[in-house]
Swiss-Prot record:
NCBIfam families per record: PRK13505.1
EC identifiers of the protein: 6.3.4.3
Lineage: Bacteria, Pseudomonadati, Bacteroidota, Bacteroidia, Bacteroidales
Organism: Bacteroides fragilis (strain ATCC 25285 / DSM 2151 / CCUG 4856 / JCM 11019 / LMG 10263 / NCTC 9343 / Onslow / VPI 2553 / EN-2)
Family: Belongs to the formate--tetrahydrofolate ligase family.
Record's protein name: Formate--tetrahydrofolate ligase
Amino acid sequence: MKSDIEIARSVELKKIKQVAESIGIPRDEVENYGRYIAKIPEYLIDEEKVKKSNLILVTAITATKAGIGKTTVSIGLALGLNKIGKKAIVALREPSLGPCFGMKGGAAGGGYAQVLPMEKINLHFTGDFHAITSAHNMISALLDNYLYQNQSKGFGLKEILWRRVLDVNDRSLRNIVVGLGPKTNGITQESGFDITPASEIMAILCLSKDVDDLRRRIENILLGYTYDNKPFTVKDLGVAGAITVLLKDAIHPNLVQTTEGTAAFVHGGPFANIAHGCNSILATKMAMTFGDYVITEAGFGADLGAEKFYNIKCRKSGLQPRLTVIVATAQGLKMHGGVSLDRIKEPNLEGLREGLRNLDKHVRNLHSFGQTVIVAFNKFASDTDEEMELLREHCEQLGVGYAINNAFSEGGEGAVDLANLVVETIENKPSEPLQFTYNDEDSVQQKIEKVATNLYGASVVTYSTLTRNKIKLIEEMGIGHYPVCIAKTQYSFSADPKVYGAVDNFELHIKDIVINNGAEMIVAIAGEIMRMPGLPKEPQALHIDIVDGNIEGLS
Protein backbone atom coordinates (compact mmCIF):
# COMPACT_ATOMS: atom_id res chain seq x y z
CA MET A 1 0.00 0.00 0.00
CA LYS A 2 1.17 3.54 -0.75
CA SER A 3 2.38 5.80 2.05
CA ASP A 4 0.09 8.52 3.43
CA ILE A 5 1.93 11.22 1.55
CA GLU A 6 1.84 9.25 -1.73
CA ILE A 7 -1.91 8.74 -1.37
CA ALA A 8 -2.38 12.43 -0.56
CA ARG A 9 -0.46 13.43 -3.70
CA SER A 10 -2.45 11.05 -5.89
CA VAL A 11 -5.75 12.77 -5.08
CA GLU A 12 -6.96 15.40 -7.54
CA LEU A 13 -8.04 18.17 -5.20
CA LYS A 14 -11.10 20.32 -5.77
CA LYS A 15 -10.77 24.09 -5.58
CA ILE A 16 -11.82 25.12 -2.08
CA LYS A 17 -14.67 27.36 -3.31
CA GLN A 18 -16.13 24.30 -5.03
CA VAL A 19 -15.96 22.38 -1.73
CA ALA A 20 -17.61 25.31 0.07
CA GLU A 21 -20.43 25.53 -2.48
CA SER A 22 -21.05 21.78 -2.18
CA ILE A 23 -22.19 22.27 1.44
CA GLY A 24 -24.01 25.57 0.90
CA ILE A 25 -21.39 28.22 1.72
CA PRO A 26 -21.62 31.17 -0.71
CA ARG A 27 -18.48 31.71 -2.82
CA ASP A 28 -18.12 35.33 -1.73
CA GLU A 29 -17.90 34.25 1.94
CA VAL A 30 -14.82 32.11 1.26
CA GLU A 31 -11.47 33.67 2.16
CA ASN A 32 -8.89 31.71 0.20
CA TYR A 33 -5.53 30.69 1.67
CA GLY A 34 -4.24 29.35 -1.64
CA ARG A 35 -6.31 27.09 -3.90
CA TYR A 36 -7.28 24.38 -1.44
CA ILE A 37 -7.61 26.02 1.99
CA ALA A 38 -9.97 28.74 3.17
CA LYS A 39 -11.24 30.52 6.24
CA ILE A 40 -14.98 30.87 6.72
CA PRO A 41 -16.30 33.85 8.76
CA GLU A 42 -17.82 32.86 12.08
CA TYR A 43 -20.96 34.98 11.52
CA LEU A 44 -22.28 32.31 9.11
CA ILE A 45 -23.10 30.05 12.06
CA ASP A 46 -26.86 29.51 12.37
CA GLU A 47 -27.85 28.34 15.87
CA GLU A 48 -31.20 26.97 14.66
CA LYS A 49 -29.45 24.73 12.14
CA VAL A 50 -26.92 23.74 14.81
CA LYS A 51 -29.76 22.39 16.97
CA LYS A 52 -31.06 20.22 14.12
CA SER A 53 -27.70 18.71 13.15
CA ASN A 54 -26.57 15.31 14.45
CA LEU A 55 -23.31 15.71 16.40
CA ILE A 56 -21.21 12.56 16.79
CA LEU A 57 -18.19 12.37 19.09
CA VAL A 58 -15.38 9.97 18.23
CA THR A 59 -13.23 8.94 21.18
CA ALA A 60 -11.03 5.92 21.95
CA ILE A 61 -9.72 3.38 24.41
CA THR A 62 -6.70 4.46 26.44
CA ALA A 63 -3.87 5.52 24.13
CA THR A 64 -0.92 3.22 23.48
CA LYS A 65 2.34 3.71 21.63
CA ALA A 66 0.92 1.45 18.92
CA GLY A 67 -1.58 4.18 17.98
CA ILE A 68 -5.37 3.87 17.84
CA GLY A 69 -6.30 5.80 14.66
CA LYS A 70 -9.09 7.97 16.05
CA THR A 71 -8.62 10.76 13.48
CA THR A 72 -8.58 8.23 10.63
CA VAL A 73 -11.85 6.72 11.91
CA SER A 74 -13.42 10.19 12.28
CA ILE A 75 -12.58 11.07 8.68
CA GLY A 76 -13.56 7.58 7.51
CA LEU A 77 -16.96 7.85 9.18
CA ALA A 78 -17.60 11.16 7.42
CA LEU A 79 -16.62 9.51 4.12
CA GLY A 80 -18.87 6.52 4.84
CA LEU A 81 -21.84 8.72 5.69
CA ASN A 82 -21.41 10.66 2.46
CA LYS A 83 -21.18 7.33 0.59
CA ILE A 84 -24.65 6.35 1.84
CA GLY A 85 -26.13 9.69 0.80
CA LYS A 86 -25.88 11.69 4.02
CA LYS A 87 -24.53 15.23 4.20
CA ALA A 88 -21.66 14.70 6.61
CA ILE A 89 -18.78 16.98 7.64
CA VAL A 90 -15.83 16.19 9.89
CA ALA A 91 -14.53 18.80 12.37
CA LEU A 92 -11.01 18.16 13.69
CA ARG A 93 -8.16 19.80 15.56
CA GLU A 94 -5.12 21.26 13.82
CA PRO A 95 -1.85 19.32 14.13
CA SER A 96 1.04 20.68 16.20
CA LEU A 97 4.55 20.92 14.75
CA GLY A 98 6.04 19.50 17.96
CA PRO A 99 4.62 15.97 17.67
CA CYS A 100 4.80 16.14 13.87
CA PHE A 101 8.60 16.29 14.09
CA GLY A 102 8.71 14.35 17.37
CA MET A 103 7.27 10.93 18.14
CA LYS A 104 3.64 10.97 16.99
CA GLY A 105 4.02 12.29 13.45
CA GLY A 106 1.26 14.23 11.69
CA ALA A 107 -2.42 14.35 12.59
CA ALA A 108 -4.33 14.55 9.32
CA GLY A 109 -5.63 10.98 9.29
CA GLY A 110 -4.06 8.15 7.34
CA GLY A 111 -4.26 6.00 4.23
CA TYR A 112 -7.39 6.73 2.19
CA ALA A 113 -9.02 8.63 5.07
CA GLN A 114 -7.11 11.91 5.25
CA VAL A 115 -7.79 15.63 5.26
CA LEU A 116 -5.97 17.46 2.47
CA PRO A 117 -3.68 19.15 1.54
CA MET A 118 -1.97 16.99 4.17
CA GLU A 119 1.47 18.61 3.93
CA LYS A 120 0.17 22.13 4.48
CA ILE A 121 -2.22 21.10 7.27
CA ASN A 122 0.59 19.30 9.14
CA LEU A 123 3.04 22.17 8.74
CA HIS A 124 2.15 25.89 8.85
CA PHE A 125 -1.46 25.63 7.53
CA THR A 126 -3.21 29.04 7.85
CA GLY A 127 -0.81 30.28 10.53
CA ASP A 128 -3.27 29.89 13.43
CA PHE A 129 -0.67 28.30 15.71
CA HIS A 130 1.83 31.03 14.84
CA ALA A 131 -0.77 33.69 15.62
CA ILE A 132 -1.52 32.03 18.98
CA THR A 133 2.20 31.73 19.75
CA SER A 134 2.75 35.39 18.84
CA ALA A 135 -0.22 36.57 20.89
CA HIS A 136 0.90 34.58 23.94
CA ASN A 137 4.51 35.76 23.74
CA MET A 138 3.43 39.34 23.05
CA ILE A 139 1.72 39.29 26.44
CA SER A 140 4.98 38.00 27.95
CA ALA A 141 6.97 40.82 26.35
CA LEU A 142 4.45 43.50 27.32
CA LEU A 143 4.31 42.20 30.90
CA ASP A 144 8.11 42.21 31.22
CA ASN A 145 8.23 45.71 29.76
CA TYR A 146 5.53 46.93 32.18
CA LEU A 147 7.51 45.59 35.13
CA TYR A 148 10.75 47.10 33.80
CA GLN A 149 9.25 50.53 33.09
CA ASN A 150 7.40 50.76 36.42
CA GLN A 151 10.00 49.36 38.82
CA SER A 152 11.18 52.89 39.65
CA LYS A 153 7.65 53.62 40.92
CA GLY A 154 7.90 50.68 43.30
CA PHE A 155 5.60 48.44 41.26
CA GLY A 156 6.30 44.73 41.05
CA LEU A 157 4.64 41.35 41.11
CA LYS A 158 5.15 38.94 43.98
CA GLU A 159 4.48 36.03 41.64
CA ILE A 160 4.43 35.87 37.83
CA LEU A 161 2.26 33.05 36.48
CA TRP A 162 2.49 33.77 32.75
CA ARG A 163 5.12 31.74 30.90
CA ARG A 164 6.03 31.60 27.21
CA VAL A 165 5.08 29.14 24.46
CA LEU A 166 6.62 27.61 21.34
CA ASP A 167 5.20 25.01 18.95
CA VAL A 168 8.13 22.61 19.26
CA ASN A 169 9.06 19.79 21.62
CA ASP A 170 12.03 21.18 23.58
CA ARG A 171 12.69 19.93 27.11
CA SER A 172 15.58 22.38 27.61
CA LEU A 173 13.12 25.31 27.59
CA ARG A 174 10.87 24.04 30.39
CA ASN A 175 12.62 26.22 32.95
CA ILE A 176 14.72 29.25 32.03
CA VAL A 177 16.00 32.53 33.46
CA VAL A 178 15.30 35.76 31.54
CA GLY A 179 16.73 39.25 31.91
CA LEU A 180 20.34 38.17 32.41
CA GLY A 181 23.11 40.70 31.80
CA PRO A 182 22.99 44.48 32.36
CA LYS A 183 19.91 46.13 33.92
CA THR A 184 18.86 47.40 30.49
CA ASN A 185 18.03 43.77 29.60
CA GLY A 186 15.06 43.79 31.95
CA ILE A 187 14.32 42.25 35.32
CA THR A 188 16.05 38.94 36.01
CA GLN A 189 13.43 36.29 36.78
CA GLU A 190 12.60 32.64 36.30
CA SER A 191 10.32 31.71 33.41
CA GLY A 192 9.84 28.82 31.02
CA PHE A 193 8.13 27.57 27.88
CA ASP A 194 5.07 25.38 27.37
CA ILE A 195 4.11 23.97 23.99
CA THR A 196 1.62 26.14 22.06
CA PRO A 197 -1.30 23.64 22.34
CA ALA A 198 -1.05 24.09 26.14
CA SER A 199 -1.33 27.89 25.87
CA GLU A 200 -4.31 29.50 27.54
CA ILE A 201 -4.69 31.53 24.34
CA MET A 202 -5.29 28.24 22.48
CA ALA A 203 -7.99 27.24 24.97
CA ILE A 204 -9.56 30.71 24.78
CA LEU A 205 -9.65 30.63 20.96
CA CYS A 206 -11.32 27.20 21.02
CA LEU A 207 -13.94 28.20 23.63
CA SER A 208 -14.81 31.71 22.37
CA LYS A 209 -18.14 32.30 20.65
CA ASP A 210 -17.07 35.42 18.71
CA VAL A 211 -14.43 38.17 18.61
CA ASP A 212 -16.04 40.12 21.46
CA ASP A 213 -16.00 37.03 23.66
CA LEU A 214 -12.39 36.40 22.62
CA ARG A 215 -11.42 39.90 23.74
CA ARG A 216 -13.31 39.57 27.03
CA ARG A 217 -11.55 36.32 27.83
CA ILE A 218 -8.12 37.71 26.92
CA GLU A 219 -8.76 40.66 29.22
CA ASN A 220 -9.40 38.24 32.11
CA ILE A 221 -6.15 36.26 31.76
CA LEU A 222 -4.42 36.08 35.13
CA LEU A 223 -0.76 37.07 34.82
CA GLY A 224 0.33 37.15 38.45
CA TYR A 225 -0.20 38.66 41.90
CA THR A 226 0.91 41.97 43.35
CA TYR A 227 2.70 42.22 46.71
CA ASP A 228 -0.65 42.92 48.38
CA ASN A 229 -2.04 39.67 46.88
CA LYS A 230 -4.26 41.29 44.26
CA PRO A 231 -4.67 39.48 40.90
CA PHE A 232 -2.94 41.23 37.98
CA THR A 233 -4.61 40.58 34.61
CA VAL A 234 -4.25 41.52 30.95
CA LYS A 235 -6.93 44.15 31.64
CA ASP A 236 -4.53 45.77 34.13
CA LEU A 237 -1.84 45.64 31.47
CA GLY A 238 -4.20 47.43 29.06
CA VAL A 239 -3.36 45.39 25.95
CA ALA A 240 -6.39 43.12 25.39
CA GLY A 241 -7.26 44.96 22.19
CA ALA A 242 -3.78 44.57 20.74
CA ILE A 243 -3.70 40.84 21.52
CA THR A 244 -7.16 40.35 19.99
CA VAL A 245 -5.94 42.05 16.80
CA LEU A 246 -3.24 39.36 16.47
CA LEU A 247 -5.99 36.71 16.57
CA LYS A 248 -8.66 38.38 14.42
CA ASP A 249 -8.09 35.99 11.49
CA ALA A 250 -7.14 32.93 13.56
CA ILE A 251 -10.60 32.83 15.16
CA HIS A 252 -12.28 31.97 11.83
CA PRO A 253 -12.63 28.21 11.14
CA ASN A 254 -10.49 26.62 8.42
CA LEU A 255 -12.15 24.72 5.57
CA VAL A 256 -10.29 21.92 3.74
CA GLN A 257 -11.32 18.63 2.09
CA THR A 258 -11.02 14.89 2.58
CA THR A 259 -9.42 12.35 0.25
CA GLU A 260 -12.86 11.99 -1.37
CA GLY A 261 -13.47 15.71 -1.83
CA THR A 262 -15.95 16.18 1.02
CA ALA A 263 -15.79 19.15 3.38
CA ALA A 264 -13.74 19.20 6.58
CA PHE A 265 -13.21 21.93 9.18
CA VAL A 266 -9.82 21.84 10.92
CA HIS A 267 -9.47 24.48 13.63
CA GLY A 268 -7.76 24.84 16.99
CA GLY A 269 -5.48 22.27 18.55
CA PRO A 270 -5.24 21.90 22.35
CA PHE A 271 -3.81 18.56 23.51
CA ALA A 272 -6.10 16.43 25.70
CA ASN A 273 -3.42 15.36 28.19
CA ILE A 274 -2.26 18.88 29.10
CA ALA A 275 -5.27 20.93 27.94
CA HIS A 276 -8.95 20.32 27.05
CA GLY A 277 -8.30 18.44 23.81
CA CYS A 278 -11.14 19.61 21.54
CA ASN A 279 -11.34 21.62 18.32
CA SER A 280 -12.97 25.04 18.43
CA ILE A 281 -16.63 25.49 19.30
CA LEU A 282 -16.90 27.78 16.28
CA ALA A 283 -15.65 25.12 13.84
CA THR A 284 -17.99 22.50 15.31
CA LYS A 285 -20.97 24.84 15.06
CA MET A 286 -19.95 25.91 11.54
CA ALA A 287 -19.90 22.26 10.47
CA MET A 288 -23.29 21.74 12.16
CA THR A 289 -24.71 24.75 10.31
CA PHE A 290 -23.90 23.17 6.95
CA GLY A 291 -23.95 19.44 7.70
CA ASP A 292 -26.73 17.06 8.76
CA TYR A 293 -24.18 14.77 10.43
CA VAL A 294 -21.05 16.22 12.03
CA ILE A 295 -18.23 14.06 13.31
CA THR A 296 -15.75 15.53 15.76
CA GLU A 297 -13.02 13.90 17.85
CA ALA A 298 -11.53 14.59 21.26
CA GLY A 299 -7.91 13.81 22.05
CA PHE A 300 -6.48 10.55 23.41
CA GLY A 301 -8.72 8.17 25.38
CA ALA A 302 -12.24 8.79 26.65
CA ASP A 303 -10.92 9.48 30.16
CA LEU A 304 -9.21 12.61 28.81
CA GLY A 305 -10.69 13.99 25.59
CA ALA A 306 -14.28 12.78 25.91
CA GLU A 307 -14.56 13.78 29.58
CA LYS A 308 -13.36 17.29 28.73
CA PHE A 309 -15.53 17.42 25.61
CA TYR A 310 -18.64 16.84 27.74
CA ASN A 311 -17.71 18.59 30.98
CA ILE A 312 -16.01 21.63 29.42
CA LYS A 313 -16.81 22.11 25.72
CA CYS A 314 -20.46 20.99 25.81
CA ARG A 315 -21.09 22.67 29.17
CA LYS A 316 -19.80 25.99 27.76
CA SER A 317 -21.42 25.75 24.32
CA GLY A 318 -24.69 23.93 24.91
CA LEU A 319 -23.77 21.27 22.35
CA GLN A 320 -25.52 17.90 22.74
CA PRO A 321 -23.95 14.90 20.96
CA ARG A 322 -26.47 12.38 19.60
CA LEU A 323 -23.97 9.52 19.72
CA THR A 324 -20.47 8.62 20.89
CA VAL A 325 -18.26 6.26 18.88
CA ILE A 326 -15.36 4.67 20.76
CA VAL A 327 -12.46 3.43 18.63
CA ALA A 328 -10.70 0.21 19.60
CA THR A 329 -7.91 -1.79 17.98
CA ALA A 330 -6.79 -5.35 18.58
CA GLN A 331 -3.21 -4.13 19.03
CA GLY A 332 -4.20 -1.51 21.59
CA LEU A 333 -6.40 -3.90 23.56
CA LYS A 334 -3.63 -6.52 23.60
CA MET A 335 -1.24 -3.95 25.08
CA HIS A 336 -3.80 -3.23 27.79
CA GLY A 337 -4.01 -6.98 28.31
CA GLY A 338 -0.32 -7.20 29.14
CA VAL A 339 1.15 -8.03 25.71
CA SER A 340 4.45 -6.25 25.00
CA LEU A 341 4.69 -3.68 22.21
CA ASP A 342 6.96 -5.89 20.09
CA ARG A 343 4.42 -8.77 20.12
CA ILE A 344 1.06 -7.04 19.66
CA LYS A 345 0.86 -7.98 15.96
CA GLU A 346 0.89 -11.68 16.89
CA PRO A 347 -2.47 -13.45 17.45
CA ASN A 348 -3.23 -13.51 21.18
CA LEU A 349 -6.85 -14.04 22.17
CA GLU A 350 -6.03 -14.27 25.86
CA GLY A 351 -4.24 -10.91 25.85
CA LEU A 352 -7.07 -9.38 23.84
CA ARG A 353 -9.68 -10.76 26.24
CA GLU A 354 -7.81 -9.30 29.23
CA GLY A 355 -7.48 -5.93 27.47
CA LEU A 356 -11.24 -5.71 26.96
CA ARG A 357 -11.48 -4.54 30.58
CA ASN A 358 -10.08 -1.20 29.38
CA LEU A 359 -12.82 -0.89 26.76
CA ASP A 360 -15.49 -1.89 29.29
CA LYS A 361 -14.43 0.82 31.72
CA HIS A 362 -14.54 3.49 29.02
CA VAL A 363 -17.99 2.34 27.87
CA ARG A 364 -19.31 2.50 31.45
CA ASN A 365 -17.89 6.00 31.80
CA LEU A 366 -19.49 7.15 28.54
CA HIS A 367 -22.84 5.71 29.62
CA SER A 368 -22.57 7.78 32.82
CA PHE A 369 -22.86 10.91 30.64
CA GLY A 370 -26.12 9.58 29.17
CA GLN A 371 -24.41 8.67 25.92
CA THR A 372 -25.43 5.95 23.51
CA VAL A 373 -22.18 4.22 22.57
CA ILE A 374 -21.05 2.13 19.61
CA VAL A 375 -17.64 0.54 19.11
CA ALA A 376 -15.68 1.11 15.90
CA PHE A 377 -13.06 -1.58 15.42
CA ASN A 378 -10.22 0.07 13.49
CA LYS A 379 -8.86 -2.74 11.33
CA PHE A 380 -5.13 -3.35 10.90
CA ALA A 381 -3.57 -5.82 8.43
CA SER A 382 -2.35 -8.07 11.27
CA ASP A 383 -5.81 -8.53 12.83
CA THR A 384 -7.29 -12.04 12.65
CA ASP A 385 -10.90 -13.08 12.07
CA GLU A 386 -10.91 -14.70 15.52
CA GLU A 387 -9.87 -11.42 17.19
CA MET A 388 -12.55 -9.45 15.37
CA GLU A 389 -15.19 -12.06 16.22
CA LEU A 390 -14.19 -12.02 19.89
CA LEU A 391 -14.68 -8.26 20.03
CA ARG A 392 -18.00 -8.47 18.17
CA GLU A 393 -19.34 -11.06 20.63
CA HIS A 394 -18.10 -9.00 23.58
CA CYS A 395 -19.87 -5.86 22.33
CA GLU A 396 -23.05 -7.89 21.88
CA GLN A 397 -22.81 -8.98 25.52
CA LEU A 398 -22.21 -5.35 26.56
CA GLY A 399 -25.28 -4.26 24.62
CA VAL A 400 -23.39 -1.78 22.44
CA GLY A 401 -23.25 -1.59 18.66
CA TYR A 402 -20.16 -2.80 16.81
CA ALA A 403 -18.83 -2.19 13.32
CA ILE A 404 -15.51 -2.69 11.57
CA ASN A 405 -13.86 0.38 10.08
CA ASN A 406 -11.46 -0.19 7.18
CA ALA A 407 -11.37 3.36 5.83
CA PHE A 408 -7.56 3.45 6.04
CA SER A 409 -7.34 0.88 3.21
CA GLU A 410 -10.64 1.43 1.41
CA GLY A 411 -11.71 5.03 2.06
CA GLY A 412 -15.43 5.68 2.46
CA GLU A 413 -16.33 2.23 1.15
CA GLY A 414 -14.53 0.70 4.14
CA ALA A 415 -16.69 2.71 6.57
CA VAL A 416 -20.14 2.06 5.08
CA ASP A 417 -21.07 -0.53 7.72
CA LEU A 418 -20.05 1.89 10.47
CA ALA A 419 -21.97 4.73 8.80
CA ASN A 420 -25.14 2.62 8.51
CA LEU A 421 -24.87 1.63 12.18
CA VAL A 422 -24.42 5.28 13.19
CA VAL A 423 -27.51 6.41 11.27
CA GLU A 424 -29.61 3.50 12.56
CA THR A 425 -28.52 4.11 16.17
CA ILE A 426 -29.21 7.86 16.05
CA GLU A 427 -32.66 7.23 14.55
CA ASN A 428 -33.63 4.52 17.05
CA LYS A 429 -31.67 5.19 20.23
CA PRO A 430 -30.01 8.63 20.36
CA SER A 431 -28.12 9.76 23.45
CA GLU A 432 -29.99 11.32 26.35
CA PRO A 433 -29.35 14.96 27.35
CA LEU A 434 -25.86 15.21 28.82
CA GLN A 435 -25.38 14.30 32.46
CA PHE A 436 -22.25 16.08 33.67
CA THR A 437 -19.84 14.47 36.15
CA TYR A 438 -20.09 17.45 38.49
CA ASN A 439 -22.13 20.60 39.02
CA ASP A 440 -20.91 24.18 38.61
CA GLU A 441 -21.53 24.85 42.30
CA ASP A 442 -19.36 21.91 43.46
CA SER A 443 -16.06 22.96 45.05
CA VAL A 444 -12.83 22.57 43.07
CA GLN A 445 -11.88 19.56 45.21
CA GLN A 446 -15.29 17.95 44.70
CA LYS A 447 -14.98 18.36 40.93
CA ILE A 448 -11.49 16.85 40.83
CA GLU A 449 -12.52 13.98 43.09
CA LYS A 450 -15.69 13.17 41.13
CA VAL A 451 -13.69 12.86 37.91
CA ALA A 452 -10.88 10.93 39.61
CA THR A 453 -13.06 8.45 41.49
CA ASN A 454 -16.05 8.06 39.16
CA LEU A 455 -14.17 8.01 35.84
CA TYR A 456 -10.52 7.16 36.50
CA GLY A 457 -11.16 4.69 39.33
CA ALA A 458 -9.00 6.38 41.97
CA SER A 459 -9.73 5.48 45.59
CA VAL A 460 -8.22 8.66 47.01
CA VAL A 461 -7.04 12.06 45.75
CA THR A 462 -4.18 13.82 47.53
CA TYR A 463 -3.04 17.42 47.15
CA SER A 464 0.29 19.16 47.54
CA THR A 465 0.51 22.16 49.87
CA LEU A 466 0.93 24.33 46.77
CA THR A 467 -2.30 22.94 45.32
CA ARG A 468 -4.26 23.47 48.55
CA ASN A 469 -3.08 27.09 48.71
CA LYS A 470 -4.19 27.67 45.12
CA ILE A 471 -7.60 26.11 45.76
CA LYS A 472 -8.04 28.53 48.66
CA LEU A 473 -7.03 31.39 46.34
CA ILE A 474 -9.57 30.24 43.73
CA GLU A 475 -12.31 30.37 46.35
CA GLU A 476 -11.23 33.87 47.42
CA MET A 477 -11.31 35.02 43.77
CA GLY A 478 -14.87 33.71 43.41
CA ILE A 479 -14.09 31.46 40.44
CA GLY A 480 -14.73 28.08 42.03
CA HIS A 481 -17.60 27.56 39.57
CA TYR A 482 -15.17 27.00 36.67
CA PRO A 483 -14.93 23.43 35.30
CA VAL A 484 -11.77 21.44 36.00
CA CYS A 485 -9.35 20.22 33.35
CA ILE A 486 -7.13 17.46 34.73
CA ALA A 487 -3.71 17.24 33.06
CA LYS A 488 -2.34 13.71 33.27
CA THR A 489 -0.71 10.98 31.22
CA GLN A 490 -2.64 9.68 28.22
CA TYR A 491 -1.35 6.11 28.67
CA SER A 492 -3.27 5.13 31.81
CA PHE A 493 -6.41 5.80 33.83
CA SER A 494 -3.95 6.63 36.62
CA ALA A 495 -1.16 9.22 36.60
CA ASP A 496 1.44 6.47 36.01
CA PRO A 497 2.07 5.97 32.26
CA LYS A 498 3.33 2.42 32.84
CA VAL A 499 0.08 1.11 34.37
CA TYR A 500 -2.08 -0.10 31.48
CA GLY A 501 -5.47 -1.79 31.43
CA ALA A 502 -8.35 -0.85 33.72
CA VAL A 503 -6.50 0.05 36.91
CA ASP A 504 -8.59 0.78 40.04
CA ASN A 505 -8.03 1.70 43.69
CA PHE A 506 -5.03 3.96 43.20
CA GLU A 507 -4.00 7.32 44.62
CA LEU A 508 -4.15 10.33 42.31
CA HIS A 509 -1.87 13.13 43.44
CA ILE A 510 -2.55 16.70 42.31
CA LYS A 511 0.80 18.47 42.49
CA ASP A 512 -0.19 21.88 41.11
CA ILE A 513 -3.02 23.97 39.72
CA VAL A 514 -2.97 26.46 36.85
CA ILE A 515 -5.74 29.06 36.89
CA ASN A 516 -6.93 29.71 33.32
CA ASN A 517 -9.10 32.70 34.20
CA GLY A 518 -9.54 33.72 30.56
CA ALA A 519 -10.44 30.24 29.37
CA GLU A 520 -12.57 29.95 32.53
CA MET A 521 -11.26 26.59 33.69
CA ILE A 522 -9.03 25.21 36.42
CA VAL A 523 -6.15 23.02 35.19
CA ALA A 524 -5.20 20.43 37.83
CA ILE A 525 -1.83 18.81 37.16
CA ALA A 526 -1.66 15.14 38.18
CA GLY A 527 1.63 13.25 38.38
CA GLU A 528 4.67 14.10 36.29
CA ILE A 529 2.92 15.39 33.18
CA MET A 530 4.95 17.99 31.26
CA ARG A 531 3.34 20.98 29.55
CA MET A 532 6.41 21.14 27.29
CA PRO A 533 7.14 17.70 25.79
CA GLY A 534 10.62 16.49 24.91
CA LEU A 535 11.80 14.75 21.75
CA PRO A 536 12.27 10.94 21.62
CA LYS A 537 15.59 9.22 20.97
CA GLU A 538 14.69 8.94 17.28
CA PRO A 539 12.45 11.90 16.37
CA GLN A 540 10.26 11.81 13.29
CA ALA A 541 12.34 14.73 11.97
CA LEU A 542 15.08 12.23 11.04
CA HIS A 543 12.78 10.77 8.37
CA ILE A 544 11.47 14.03 6.89
CA ASP A 545 13.17 15.53 3.85
CA ILE A 546 12.51 17.40 0.63
CA VAL A 547 13.62 15.86 -2.67
CA ASP A 548 13.07 17.58 -6.02
CA GLY A 549 10.61 19.92 -4.33
CA ASN A 550 8.54 17.08 -2.83
CA ILE A 551 8.28 16.48 0.92
CA GLU A 552 9.10 12.95 2.06
CA GLY A 553 8.55 11.16 5.37
CA LEU A 554 5.58 13.21 6.57
CA SER A 555 2.79 11.01 7.90
